């Protein structure tokens, strides 16, 4: 029968703890790799679905051209993602091949985003703006900058607005028009 000294047992346990740390509260097993790539995953899934729906040939050149044209219509965080990928005219780097090559063999968007994260961590740091339900929020309690942002997200602008009440009145006036197309407004 083999008996280890207490020091050896403590050293062994410490080694196990370092090599396999215990998850702390709030931490998820496996780190849920896709949880932080929401913009990338959503965008690439929508892009892939559009290619499938239109019956596009999955060659590298075709996917690259389609991705660049798909990025022309993007706004906000998705436009920023296109910039990071190099699919916009003003992009500094071009890593489109890191999307087109895996997509040509029908790799899932989540796996593509994980690979992109290794190249540029900013890609997975993108998050969609929280959405605002105009029916449940009191516009009078919001800041003017937030009210301007609502109008900007609708593509509207108030040049004659001098006070906060002007912005509130304009948003309430335009809300039925945009509530039909956008049930929730980005804030």
Swiss-Prot record:
Triggers of expression: Not induced by endoplasmic reticulum stress.
Tissue: Widely expressed in neuronal and non-neuronal tissues. In the brain, highest levels in the optic nerve and corpus callosum.
Disulfide pairings: 37-124, 40-113, 71-82
Compartments, record wording: Secreted
Leader sequence segment: 1-24
Entry-linked SUPFAM superfamilies: SAP domain
GO cellular component, one term: endoplasmic reticulum
Xref: Gene3D superfamilies: SAP domain, Saposin-like
Keyword Transferase: no
Keywords: Disulfide bond, Growth factor, Secreted, Signal
Source organism superkingdom: Eukaryota
An MF annotation (GO) of this entry: growth factor activity
InterPro entries tied to this protein: ARMET-like, ARMET_C, ARMET_N, SAP_dom_sf
GO biological process, one term: neuron projection development
UniProt-listed PANTHER family: ARMET-LIKE PROTEIN, CEREBRAL DOPAMINE NEUROTROPHIC FACTOR
Family affiliation: Belongs to the ARMET family.
Function, as annotated: Trophic factor for dopamine neurons. Prevents the 6-hydroxydopamine (6-OHDA)-induced degeneration of dopaminergic neurons. When administered after 6-OHDA-lesioning, restores the dopaminergic function and prevents the degeneration of dopaminergic neurons in substantia nigra.
Protein name, per record: Cerebral dopamine neurotrophic factor
Organism field: Homo sapiens (Human)
Classification of source organism: Eukaryota, Metazoa, Chordata, Craniata, Vertebrata
